[in-house]
């Protein structure tokens, strides 16, 4: 038996089935860098409409984690797509390079306390730049389009000056002020925090009911000992008690229990007595709140006399309706006491320890949480503790250190949000869209209840607050003076603030005041003020405000989205973004948060080593990223399987049958109806893909392509094999098939480049095309409107309407050993199944589409073995009249003769 394999057009390509992405991807990335593909892309698009994704700066500290990968790769999808679809879309990455984490990380390496302020700042800058350079290399490994040469750092001189100018503008407009009042204080970071830096976690606390003995009651009560009863979950604040607040509209009851009197808000009496076991209490009388105002009592720890005040913040929902007030450690307490002229005494220092103002030798220098038990013991010993229990409740924590925070009164700088809130809400509602139906709503929730933003921090590594104080330590709110400070810093560098004497920043007006002493502000600005002014960099690159899109994790609704919205609205009277896209967090395969202690951390660079960056990118594209998404070995394997289908079924097979095709010579849209059908199917896919990219919906892109490849491989690729392998190499039918496959392959490569750019670049390099670009990234998405294939498609659709039913019949025939392969089959099809006259009149074409030996139409559908002879070249089965001899069909014989 003769071997006819040498006469066939067997598929061949150098594009490997095995991806070896960990080896190939770095080489492809090097190709992009050496050939300046990013620069050429921007040059190509420079006159097109801009689409600007403004990069939210990650923190320059440590290696990138899987959350970084999710964020940066999503951004790369956005930028890559727009650059390939008629937009000018530069990607300018940024880094947040100031703040506490850098100081903390550096303190583990060197003793910062031994250095001067500027020496510490120089060390912080050096460390931050090292971290940026490290992260750049790691981000590049993910396959990002940017060359990272154009970037912004919050420590850049021009950036800092822009930020200082923004501060000055806000000061001029009356949005910035200084005040002394309780703010969130992180003893673990030794600095004030803004609300956006607070996260809440459950924590156990002591909840206590405490007696505060009345000493002067103007004969309101009986002669029996009388106490005001308070409830608190912060026993450590009792040494700072300076008042008890009651609600002016509440009624208060005097009750008796075991020869002692107690005052409780009337609506809470029953709850109180059940909780503390006073069931057999005796009601004595009720009072209006104003009759209790100014009644004196003994503060239980300090033993000083204090008095009752009234304020509407007091609630009858829990506790006793009497609130212990420590104005240094509660904002409501502070405002309530301020109305009565009660002085605020801050008896806890920046480290969370009692200072000398506590006037208590046992408590002085004690950490505030450690004092809880000491205070409980004293209350018990003095019979002032009515009831004690441990409760679990939500407590504010420093989101960096994860330690609890307190309210602590300090002098701080604030931005008034109340003053700009109407403008913020207007621009949020009118100018901003979001991919999430709750996106704008969440932003609204985050901003509407914020009265102010504390922007001062008690650290050294950051942008200084450019304010000067007089000899009474009052801030000089002189705009000309502040502008002069910024001019000096612009000339000499921001470090000059920490290095030069105050006189270097004074204007002649103040220098002439020879007998006056002036002081520089020591605080720096909140890093959220740093990053919240990052939109200023757009102007340096001739890009317009606002940016088209901000894309970050959903935690940035309270962070960068929020701070940028506040400053941007103050400066430009509209939000700095048109579109908000928020992604969730990355969890492990079981849905748990990743942590080193659990051993469930997934390193994106390890994923790149094992699977390749393109599989990592495909996992991200294939995730519902707007919610928390999971990653595990099993999930990565599932996406690796999808990747293999794309690589081998679509890319490799298509390349292998295009090895003798030159588009500049052979390509044509004048193709058979089969090709028209698949081209039309691809065009419909392409339209949906473009829409999905526009909507930041990458999961739909993956699903669409996955289904298309399955459909393509299950019929069209199988159907064309005979023609591709067996027809003469230059047969017009082969060229029509290759034209369709070329078009689908090339545009699939383009469509998928935003998601798997390394693989599409590799496949593109094997695509024979005299007119192709230097890189796949320099290609453009095609205009789908040019496709109007209608003629002939209806016949293929009619075939598809019965395809599955006939294939099921063929499968049953194989199971019943009637057939070994479909091409042996003689199929009769019930006439009522197919309504297309063209197909009824062309049974040979229909047989070819079904891949069977013969088709006829009858009253019933049936599958039998045709018992035809097999051609040893094409392996199809033919009746005697279509065989040249016992080995070859007439078609194969003619082709071989042409080859000879």
From Swiss-Prot:
Residues forming coiled coils: none
EC number: 6.1.1.5
Main localization of the protein described in the UniProt heading: cytoplasm
Gene Ontology biological-process annotations: isoleucyl-tRNA aminoacylation
Binding site residues for ATP: 596
Subcellular location: Cytoplasm
GO cellular component, one term: cytosol
Residue numbers covered by motif 'HIGH' region: 58-68
UniProt keyword terms in alphabetical order: Aminoacyl-tRNA synthetase, ATP-binding, Cytoplasm, Ligase, Nucleotide-binding, Protein biosynthesis
Motif 'KMSKS' region positions after renumbering to this chain: 593-597
Record field: catalytic activity: tRNA(Ile) + L-isoleucine + ATP = L-isoleucyl-tRNA(Ile) + AMP + diphosphate
Molecular function GO labels: aminoacyl-tRNA deacylase activity; ATP binding; isoleucine-tRNA ligase activity; tRNA binding
Annotated binding of L-isoleucyl-5'-AMP, by residue: 552
Gene3D superfamilies: 1.10.730.20, HUPs (3.40.50.620), Ile-tRNA synthetase CP2 domain-like (1.10.10.830)
Stored InterPro entries: aa-tRNA-synth_I_CS, aa-tRNA-synth_Ia, Anticodon_Ile_BEm, Ile-tRNA-ligase, Ile-tRNA-ligase_type1, Ile-tRNA_ligase, M/V/L/I-tRNA-synth_anticd-bd, Rossmann-like_a/b/a_fold
Comment on protein domains: IleRS has two distinct active sites: one for aminoacylation and one for editing. The misactivated valine is translocated from the active site to the editing site, which sterically excludes the correctly activated isoleucine. The single editing site contains two valyl binding pockets, one specific for each substrate (Val-AMP or Val-tRNA(Ile)).
Self-association state and partner proteins as the record states: Monomer.
Family named by the database record: Belongs to the class-I aminoacyl-tRNA synthetase family. IleS type 1 subfamily.
Function: Catalyzes the attachment of isoleucine to tRNA(Ile). As IleRS can inadvertently accommodate and process structurally similar amino acids such as valine, to avoid such errors it has two additional distinct tRNA(Ile)-dependent editing activities. One activity is designated as 'pretransfer' editing and involves the hydrolysis of activated Val-AMP. The other activity is designated 'posttransfer' editing and involves deacylation of mischarged Val-tRNA(Ile).
Protein name: Isoleucine--tRNA ligase
Organism: Ureaplasma parvum serovar 3 (strain ATCC 700970)
